[in-house]
């Protein structure tokens, strides 16, 4: 049961071969045993989870269950969940118990009947590429516990890779689902911006943030995505579109598929062995009936600098609400209101968050707004236009997800620029608002390599189909880390 797919678990629950309580207990026991090594979860509430499992069993017995009712999953601790600690990996919210459910949580609990096993560790306020900025300590990669799992959804990635949960939620602002998926041998999907509600998802950069699924396979991601999507009037950026069944087209053949290979993503800057694994995966696609065309994304080299103006600018605004007045951490000693603000924020935020708040405040300040922020927004439009032009010549774009395999804990902690370049292939997708995936495509030195798939707007079905057909022809996604038991 530990390695079963969501579809297999669904069939087992429906056939009464196992109960949700038994299944949830199995994973909760595994979390209790292995989480001290991995630090993937920051909050586990066994009784809450088992009560949800009992409710799910009642729905199954009554014949009112959905496809995933009773299946336990992990929730990234960026989603508010009523009655649960919702920390966002920060001292600022270390004791914050949410009074309400995020829309994604409500849809999963109340509508789909999924069971939450707990809240997973993450980079503080989702700011990081290695899960080393969390107030609750670094997460360790199950493939090598001396290495990072990627970030910011590193806790979710480590939890699923080590089978502490069969699937998990993540969020992606510049690569935070795809990069950990690549480093932990998972399938991760960032949907088109606006497809998944951001209500109750603690904001980092509101024009970039998007929630999505992380699991072993494309099929599992499709099933989980079905429970997450839908218009939400409480999110002003939510898109009102017909709800799709993302598992519908998984088995379609790939004959005639046109794969775009951006020349800018296949030059220097990527580890040679990682690139070899990516090229081998593309060759496998050609065997499945696809053809490759060279395309250009001429402004993609500007994506990292543009992102590190826009995202910190939005973060400096979003994080101004954390001031110690109504909720969250408050400095124990202060002289007056201004002193309370300063001490609370100085003590409550970690170094990387403070760095990005300072950058954001600077680029939005009088005299620098036009030179930095407006210029970054112009570049963002050019990057989006490049993708529009590219998709006239191809159906899906492929590239490495990350320029390297998982690096050692602490290796890049003192060099923010090197850390930021970990997301060099993923950031442009967020700036354009496109859907993107990472799927396992090989190993280098025993560490996983991810292949990035980028689709046109609302092409999640096509991406999942392309990923699924590759996973039917290969077994990379079925490999599990050893040595963590």
From Swiss-Prot:
Name of the protein this chain belongs to: Glutamyl-tRNA(Gln) amidotransferase subunit A
Function in brief: Allows the formation of correctly charged Gln-tRNA(Gln) through the transamidation of misacylated Glu-tRNA(Gln) in organisms which lack glutaminyl-tRNA synthetase. The reaction takes place in the presence of glutamine and ATP through an activated gamma-phospho-Glu-tRNA(Gln).
GO cellular component terms given for this protein: glutamyl-tRNA(Gln) amidotransferase complex
PROSITE patterns reported for this sequence: AMIDASES
Gene symbol of the encoding locus: gatA
EC number: 6.3.5.7
Reactions that this protein is recorded to catalyse: L-glutamyl-tRNA(Gln) + L-glutamine + ATP + H2O = L-glutaminyl-tRNA(Gln) + L-glutamate + ADP + phosphate + H(+)
GO biological process terms, semicolon-separated: translation
Active site residues of this protein: 76, 152, 176
Keywords from the UniProt entry: ATP-binding, Ligase, Nucleotide-binding, Protein biosynthesis
């Amino acid at each position: 049961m530990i390695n079963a797919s969501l579809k297999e678990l669904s069939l087992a629950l429906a056939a009464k071969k196992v109960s949700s309580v038994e299944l949830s207990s199995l994973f909760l026991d595994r979390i209790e045993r292995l989480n001290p090594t991995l630090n993937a979860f920051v909050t586990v509430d066994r009784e809450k989870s088992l009560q949800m499992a009992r409710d799910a069993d009642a729905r199954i017995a009554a014949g009112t269950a959905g496809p995933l009712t009773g299946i336990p999953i992990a929730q990234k601790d960026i989603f508010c969940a009523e009655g649960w600690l919702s920390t966002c990996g920060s001292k600022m919210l270390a004791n914050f118990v949410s009074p309400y459910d995020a829309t994604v949580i409500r849809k999963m609990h109340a509508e789909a009947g999924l069971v939450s096993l707990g809240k997973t560790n993450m980079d503080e306020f989702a700011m990081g590429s290695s899960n080393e900025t969390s107030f609750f300590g670094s997460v360790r990669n199950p493939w090598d516990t001396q290495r990072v799992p990627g970030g910011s959804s590193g806790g979710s990635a480590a939890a699923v890779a080590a089978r502490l949960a069969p699937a998990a939620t993540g969020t992606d602002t510049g690569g935070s689902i795809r990069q950990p998926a690549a480093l932990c041998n998972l399938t991760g999907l960032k949907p088109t911006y606006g497809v998944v509600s951001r209500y109750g998802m603690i904001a980092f950069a509101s024009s970039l943030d998007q929630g999505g699924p992380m699991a072993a396979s494309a099929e599992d991601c499709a099933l989980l995505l079905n429970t997450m999507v839908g218009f939400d009037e409480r999110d002003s950026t939510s898109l009102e579109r017909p709800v799709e069944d993302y598992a519908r087209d998984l088995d379609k053949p790939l004959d005639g598929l046109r794969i775009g290979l951006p020349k800018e993503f296949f030059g220097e800057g990527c580890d040679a062995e990682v690139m070899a694994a990516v090229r081998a995966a593309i060759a496998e696609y050609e065997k499945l009936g696809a053809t490759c065309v060279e395309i250009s994304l001429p402004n993609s080299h500007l994506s990292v600098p543009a992102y590190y103006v826009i995202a910190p600018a939005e973060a400096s605004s979003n994080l101004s609400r954390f001031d110690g007045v109504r909720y969250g951490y408050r400095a124990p000693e202060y002289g007056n209101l201004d002193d309370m603000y300063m001490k609370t924020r100085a003590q409550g935020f970690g170094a990387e968050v403070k760095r990005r708040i300072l950058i954001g405040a600077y680029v939005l300040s009088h005299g620098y707004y036009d030179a930095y922020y407006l210029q970054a927004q112009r570049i963002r439009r050019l990057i989006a236009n490049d993708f529009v032009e590219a998709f006239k010549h191809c159906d899906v774009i492929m590239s490495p997800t990350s320029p390297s395999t998982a690096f050692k804990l602490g290796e890049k902690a003192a060099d923010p620029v090197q850390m930021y370049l970990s997301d060099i292939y993923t950031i442009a997708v967020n700036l354009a608002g496109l859907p993107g995936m990472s799927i396992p495509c090989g190993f280098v030195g025993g560490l996983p390599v991810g292949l990035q798939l980028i689709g046109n707007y609302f092409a999640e079905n096509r991406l999942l189909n392309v990923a699924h057909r590759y996973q039917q022809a290969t077994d990379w996604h079925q490999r599990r880390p050893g040595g963590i038991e």
